Amino acid sequence: FLPIASLLGKYL
């Protein structure tokens, strides 16, 4: 999956 999704997961 995209690395951006990982960052969003941390914030959400």
UniProtKB/Swiss-Prot annotation:
It is found in: Secreted. Keywords: Amphibian defense peptide, Antibiotic, Antimicrobial, Secreted. Coiled coil: none annotated. One of its GO terms (biological process) is defense response to bacterium. GO terms for cellular component: extracellular region. Expressed by the skin glands. The keyword Secreted applies. Its main location: secreted. Belongs to the frog skin active peptide (FSAP) family. Temporin subfamily. May act as an antimicrobial peptide. Show low antibacterial activity against Gram-positive bacterium S.aureus (MIC>200 uM). Shows no detectable hemolytic activity towards human erythrocytes. This is Ranatuerin-5. The lineage of its organism: Eukaryota, Metazoa, Chordata, Craniata, Vertebrata.
